[in-house]
Amino acid sequence: MFLQFYDKLTERLRGAGDWVAPLGLRFLLAHEFWTAGVGKFGVGTEAPNWFANQDFIFPFGLLSANANWVLVTWGEILAAIALVLGLFTRFFAFTLLIITVVAIAAVHWPASWDSLGQLWEGYSVSRVMDDGEFRGNFRIPFLFMAMIAPLVFMGGGKLSLDHLLLKFTQRVELIEQRNQDFLAFGIAAFIFGLVAVYLIPLWGVLLLIASAALSGYAFYQRQ
């Protein structure tokens, strides 16, 4: 009796969750990145000194500081609008994921650390100093990444323009379809590897190798 009740309850929670679960993530992230983008927009197209002095990861390091400033500014503003509307949610969520990784690597990540324990000292809201060394303050950006990831994988939910587009193009059945093959996990490993390679290169390389292996095996199975 209890299990039957629990199953019925979770069935309805999943049903409602398809509509409302992503909303909190979308609106909160939209607010945070809109505020950040508009704040930069008020400065203009000239990057301030603190931004111009940062070492950006490849390939953004090949661009000028002003070009990166404009890209980040408009990336945050447009992504915030898209998240509120639920339009092209996965694309703009992935865009914000890249922006966040670049910010962590350039601003928040310590230049050197001897152990994971020492690195974890930087999991803080404020800058942590240990014997005069910068330990980072990457807690909030990490939380943003954890919030962005479900939108990359699951999309904006049924209460979104993405859902209306699926209905308009008569592809609404795709919402319920799931494909948990090796290629799916290969794509997931690629996304996480792309993030990790700029922060902890060894982990990132291993994930990218795993991605290639999983994807290759998936294509091999199809032959």
For each feature predicted by the language model, list its residue ranges.
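Short, basic/aromatic beta-hairpin or loop at an interaction surface
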Residues: Q54-G61
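Extended, low-polarity transmembrane helix blocks
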Residues: M1-E46, L62-W74, L87-Q223
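Short Gly/aromatic-enriched secondary-structure transition segments
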Residues: G44-Q54
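Extracellular/periplasmic metallocenter environments
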Residues: A79
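Juxtamembrane transmembrane-helix termini
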Residues: A82-G86
